[in-house]
Amino acid sequence: MRRLEWKFMKRALILTKGRNYSMNASIEMMRNIGVVAHIDAGKTTLTERLLFLSGELRRMGDVDSGSTVTDFLEVERERGITVQSAIVSLPWKEHRINLIDTPGHVDFGVEVQRCVRVLDGLLVVLDGSAGVQAQTLTVWRQAAKYSLPSLFLVNKMDKPQADFAMSISSIEDKLGLRALPVVIPFSRETALEGFIDLVEGRCLKLSKGKNSEWMTIETKSCEFDVFSEGKENMCFGLSDSDQSFSSLFLDKYQGDTSKVSREDITQALRRVSLSRSACVVSSGSALRSASSVRPCLDLICNLLPSPVNSSKLVKESIGNHFSGLLFKIIHDKRRGRIGYTRVYSGELKGGSHLWNWTRGEKEGPIELFEAQSDSLDPIKSAKEGSIVAVRGLEKSLTGDAFIALDCDKRSFPEEDPASHIVFDG
């Protein structure tokens, strides 16, 4: 069997079919998130685990064997590193999450910069034995330019050298942020035992291997003391970062953590995440236990913003007409030149012509595809907030802005619509 035929057959065996579960999700239920990290922090393995947990994959691939969904180039599979960004979509509790897995090597920083421009939030992955590293700092500066809310995952906590406290300190010292741990590791002597979710009041024990599942922490369990101390630290940290929560927790509840509800904590965590007044930190070991990174999916949906605000900014200028930004161009072996585009307002329809506002040229007719890494599925239209693959933009370049042909050409914002977005709850 020819190599190309085997590639597509293998992909069909791995990816699940019938992905209409959340493709029609409202804009409020969308999340456009980038996964960023320094090289070898476990970013691609994390993405693979999230796809599996969501039901998008029948089985998980492995970076070392070259079988992951998002590292599909030959050089990526051979070297075990991400060279170019890959886009995947997955469902989680009525939400549609569009994830962009970005390169972690400093040599491909431009690729990351192009993607950050069209995102609404970031999931920053740290190696638990190294904390914040060079590429982490670079990406953080880019995120600050667009005021992107961010979550952190301290990964690889099963490594002998892993140090969660050191990783937290590196976030606060190098990025100048207050770190709020919400999923913490717990150990027996020096061995990692599992993880505790301080928001949900549950724990995951790694001793049960691949069958490990999150279980509610009982008051008589040996994990309860670790949970109680961790929740208290989290609540006092939140009080220092959010005035509303401070009034509730310190004044109304007199610092009693048992009176604070999950909803109280989640709403406060969302406020500090959107305002970037603090950063929420989870922990896990994506390679050893897929379940350990399950809280990341809940945190993405509960704490990070939808595309509503960025769409609202553009609509103030051009109403409900289509507008979009081309942020990545690839050459697909089967379909030729493909442009990845973020839809900021209106609806993008297959077969239509567009006006390249940046260059003053007409483009089209276009074909639309939903991208799942290197797999492109034809679709008829894409609504605002979507990230979509477009064929037919033959004269356009990365960074070009598009509007509908019937839109007033003078009304498009002079500045990049992502430049001055302020997120609210």
Regions found by a protein language model. Give the residues of each.
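Structural and coupling elements of P-loop NTPases
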Residues: 2-425
